[in-house]
Amino acid sequence: MRLFGKRGADRVAVVGAGVMGLATAHALASDGRDVTVYEQFEVGHNRGSSHGATRIFRFAYPNEHWVRMAQEALPGWRALEEESGETLLELPGLLEFSTDPDKSSRDALDACGAPYELLEPADVEARFSVNVPPGMTALFQPDAGVVYAERAQRAFLRGAQGRGAKIEQGVRVDSIDDVDAEVVVVTGGAWAQQLLATAGIALPVVPTRETIAYFRLEGKPPSVVAEIANGHGFYALKDPVHGLKVGRHKAGPPTDPDLQAAPDPEIVTEIAKWTGERFQLAEPGPAAADTCLYTNTMDERFILERRGRVVIGSACSGHGFKFAPVVGARLAALATG
């Protein structure tokens, strides 16, 4: 099936209406472009990588590249808040646990001028009711917390539509050749690989199905990351329904995104054990569990580039959401430059 939009030099199609696709459409429409977004399910669906109430926002990364990108993203989120009239960020701070101070975010934060505190375990317990793992150091960074993910997607969507962008839901694009546009931006997440292959483009990513669990916890907990940079570390963040959302980074198996699967009970057990050991005020048993998709590159860096009339927007590896304002602007620039 060929998908026809208006003809003209500035016609751009975006395939995939997760947060990156919506951010790209918002940026393109803000620049006066003729934009059509194609989504195989519906905006806000639970089959991909963007669903759920919250995502971590943080400056704390061991690599300066990510710190600076997060610093660039923050004013983008604030501008979207002002435009939408909604609170999209809540920033009570983030605790980072690491076995090796030299592999923590300390040096990168210093290089980027971002504030932080190095805390003793007793200070962490007193301030946050969180236990520091034995043998680990604790770093607190205040420019962190959560992005309200569902609100953020709606804000990008409304802003794009208000500037003339069209959203075609329930339309699956099976081939780049089916899209009648001057430029096609592919932000299909775990489905991008198979779509790009139809244009002869090999995308070096591995989709995995990850498990998360929710726990009842009162108050505003800080976000927490523990050894994320060194492998399959744990992370936690506020959930507005249950209190706390917890996952184990990159612990899930490779998957076909067209298949659906239940949360992995073994991973839920591991998550529950970690949560019970760290969060003094969390109820011990999970209140719920869910899955999401990661689209992993070898080094967790994003693939944002143009090949002919195709722009590739693979910005995930399990940590992309916070960067959506930046990624959307960069993909829009690639599409129109």
Question: Model regions: which residues?
Answer:
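Beta1/beta-strand and adjacent pyrophosphate-binding region of the FAD-binding site
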Residues: 4-20, 36
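Glycine-rich phosphate/pyrophosphate-binding beta-alpha loops
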Residues: 62, 310-324
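Dinucleotide-binding Rossmann-like beta1-alpha1 core, especially the glycine-rich loop
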Residues: 53-127, 135-136, 233-234
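Internal hydrophobic alpha-helix adjacent to the cofactor/substrate pocket in enzyme cavities
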Residues: 325-337
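Short hydrophobic core segments
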Residues: 15, 38, 179-191, 195, ...
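Glycine-rich FAD pyrophosphate-binding loop
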Residues: 30-49
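Helical element adjacent to the flavin cofactor pocket in flavoenzyme catalytic cores
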Residues: 140-174
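Active-site substrate-recognition segment that forms the wall
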Residues: 26-30, 87-89, 190-309
